[in-house]
Structure formats: C-alpha cells, structure tokens
From Swiss-Prot:
Binding site for S-adenosyl-L-methionine: 185, 213, 218, 234, 294
Alphabetical list of PANTHER family matching this protein: TRNA/TMRNA (URACIL-C(5))-METHYLTRANSFERASE (PTHR47790), TRNA_TMRNA (URACIL-C(5))-METHYLTRANSFERASE (PTHR47790:SF2)
Any GO CC annotation of this UniProt entry: cytosol
One of the protein's GO biological processes: tRNA methylation
PROSITE patterns from the UniProt entry: SAM_MT_RNA_M5U (PS51687), TRMA_1 (PS01230), TRMA_2 (PS01231)
Protein's name according to its UniProt entry: tRNA/tmRNA (uracil-C(5))-methyltransferase
EC number(s) from the headed UniProt entry: 2.1.1.-, 2.1.1.35
Catalytic activity: uridine(54) in tRNA + S-adenosyl-L-methionine = 5-methyluridine(54) in tRNA + S-adenosyl-L-homocysteine + H(+); uridine(341) in tmRNA + S-adenosyl-L-methionine = 5-methyluridine(341) in tmRNA + S-adenosyl-L-homocysteine + H(+)
Organism: Azotobacter vinelandii (strain DJ / ATCC BAA-1303)
Superkingdom assignment: Bacteria
Active-site residues from the entry: 319 (nucleophile), 353 (proton acceptor)
Job of this protein: Dual-specificity methyltransferase that catalyzes the formation of 5-methyluridine at position 54 (m5U54) in all tRNAs, and that of position 341 (m5U341) in tmRNA (transfer-mRNA).
InterPro entries: MeTrfase_TrmA_AS, MeTrfase_TrmA_CS, SAM-dependent_MTases_sf, TrmA_MeTrfase, U5_MeTrfase_fam
CDD domains: AdoMet_MTases
Length: 361
C-alpha cells in the first residue's frame, strides 16, 4: 500500500480537479454536470495495510511513497485511517514485542467498520504454533478485536474472520458481513452516499433488475427494495457466500444469486451454452428493465457492453473514469447519460469513483 500525500488544506482544490476531469471525460456525451459527494478530510479509510520495517532493534509500521517503492516511510499513526485503526496501532506495536506474536511478523492489515467492529490480520514468514495461538487469543481479548494469523499454507482465526457493518439507506439500516481478505469499499461514509444515490436514481420499479459484479451484496440489498426481483452475479466464492448471508440476515428474499462471471452470464442470456449453476433459474421468466454494473477497473468487456444495449436503463458505478468513458462511447448511439455523480472514495489520490445513469434514446 502506498502512502497518499495527506494535506487537508488541499482537499477542496483536489476535489474540484477531479470534478473537472470527470466532466471533461463525459463532455462528448452531453452528460449533465456531476453531482459531487465529498469525503471526510481525515479518518475516512476503514482498512489499511502496513509492512513492518526494522531499524536497529526496533520495528515500525511502514508504507512507501508512490514515486519510490524502495524507500519506506515510517509511521506511528495514519491520519487518513479510521480512529479505531489509529487507536489500535500503538497497542499492537507494543504487543509485537512479545516474541510469540512478533517473531518473523512482516505485515499487518486492519479492517474496521463504521459500526465499530475491527479485525487485524498478522502475516508471518514462519509457521504459527500453539504459543502464537495463546498470545493471539490474549491480545484479541485485550484489544476487543478478531485476529487472523497468516503464513504460507496456514490461516488461523481468533474470534471471527469477518467484520460486521451497518449502513443506512433511505431510512433503512442494512447489516453487512465483510470477510477478511475480500473486497469492501474502503471509505464507509462515501460508500453510504453511493448507496443512497444509487437507490434514488434507480427509483421505484415494477420490473426486474440484473446486477453484474455484485460482490458481498453492497448495492444488492438496497436496490432489491426498489424492484420486483433481482438476478445478481458474482465470481468470487467468498463474496458469494457473504452476499447470501447478507441477504438472509436482512430479510431480502427477492434476489437470486448465481456464481458466474459477467462474460458467462452474457453467454447464458445469448443461449451460447448452458451452465449447471443456472439450473432451476428461468432466465426467460425475468422482465429486466434495468441493468446495474459495478465492474473492475478494466470496465465492461465488449460482449457485456453489447448485452447492456438490451436494457432501457443502465446504472453504472465505476472505479475508473477512463474505462467508464470508453464504455459509454460504445453505448452512446443507443443510450444517453441522464445523471452522473462523483464519489470521492480516495481523497489525496488521483483515483475516483463515479456513477452514471444511462437511458435508451
């Protein structure tokens, strides 16, 4: 993980630059000006990863400058991380003086939530034994966290291997299980704004929604309340299991979740070939009015873009505005951008999250 150049006095100017950049990318499509959703200036990041760096007999949390990956920047705190992470950092540093915990420890990962949950992953260049287990159990109790120990071919869990989050969308609180090692949105406050925007933009519908790349159900849960039924796809087994748990714990019963990639579902809808994982799913029985996509940085592949043309409405959340613009260019002859938004998930970096609603011309 690289260290962002943190300076709250520059935040507003950086956000304005991102807005101008997004507006410029979407200008060829006559898009409206983006709605802008800012971030807290500090303590916004709910997860963080640090290497450990030795200087003499002492070891420190370390990150690296994006311009020089070989030179560490030693840290005692991390202002962009959540207050919970900053509280845990010195207490964990004191604990790794215990040889059972500190011997050949080379990396530490923190995962926290707005709801107050926390999990620490400790990564080692050695096998973990019963002495480690005993020390980790004691530390977990002292810190009020779960701990996962990792070494090659080994993963030991003290407590739980997930955290629990609660996010309010349109007045309803949704509970999310977020597994260790799986993707979650790092900026919880901005994630909540994204969910509320998407819920508002989708609107109340009397037809069905197809969702690609659903992850742990982050968007699935609130969007399912706006439509008749949802067919959602995700390729990661860990994320699928978390999504199924999240659907059940929130009482959302109008979602069918299948473990397929977007490319595979496209083949299924085009009747290129059958998939065993779709056994019992009547694809032709759905009345899809909207498509929701939240693809990886590469955006939608050409076949998925062609699939998207079939939908009257496309709600697209993007972590890469360049591939978003490229995908819109493919769809521009059939769809127009009617709403767009900038979500500042990653302050003090050039990265941005954005969203658009496209409607058929």
């Amino acid at each position: 993980m690289s260290l962002p150049h943190f300076d709250p006095s520059h935040y507003d100017a950086q956000l304005a630059d991102k807005q101008a950049r997004l507006s410029g990318l979407l200008a060829p499509f006559a898009a409206p000006e983006p709605e802008v959703f800012d971030s807290p200036r500090e303590h916004y990041r709910l997860r963080a990863e640090f290497r450990l760096w030795r200087e003499g007999e002492a070891r420190h949390y370390a990150m690296f400058d994006p311009g020089d990956k070989r030179k560490p920047i030693l840290l005692d705190d991390f202002p962009i991380a959540s207050e919970r992470i900053n509280d845990l950092m010195p207490r964990l540093k004191a604990a790794w003086e215990n040889a059972a915990l500190g011997f050949k420890l080379f990396q530490v990962e923190f995962l926290t939530t707005l709801a107050g949950d926390a999990l620490i992953t400790l990564c080692y260049h050695r096998p973990l034994d019963t002495f480690w287990q005993t020390a980790a159990e004691r530390l977990a109790a002292e810190l009020g966290v779960s701990i996962v120990g990792r070494s090659r071919g080994q993963r030991l869990v003290v407590g739980r291997d997930y955290v629990e989050e609660e996010l309010e969308v349109a007045g309803r609180r949704f509970r999310y299980r977020q597994p260790e090692g799986a993707f979650t949105q790092p900026n919880g406050v901005v994630c909540r704004k994204m969910l509320n925007w998407a819920h508002d933009v989708l609107g109340e519908r009397d037809d069905d929604l197809l969702e690609l790349y659903c992850g742990n159900g982050n968007f699935t849960l609130p969007l399912a309340t706006r439509v008749r039924r949802v067919l959602a796809t995700e390729i990661s087994k860990t994320s699928v299991n978390a999504a199924l748990t999240n659907l059940e714990s929130n009482g959302v019963d109008n979602v069918t979740l299948v473990r397929l990639s977007a490319e595979e579902l496209t083949q299924a809808l085009n009747e290129v070939r059958p998939f065993r994982r779709l056994a019992g799913v009547d694809l032709k029985g759905y009345d899809f009015g909207s498509l929701f996509v939240d693809p990886p940085r590469a955006g939608m592949d050409p076949d998925t873009c062609e699939l998207a043309r079939r939908f009257g409405r496309i709600l697209y959340i993007s972590c890469n505005p360049e591939t978003l613009a490229a995908n819109i260019a493919r769809l521009h002859d059939t769809h127009r951008v009617v709403r767009c938004a900038l979500f500042d998930q990653f302050p003090y970096t050039h990265h941005m999250e954005s969203g658009v609603l496209l409607e058929r011309r």
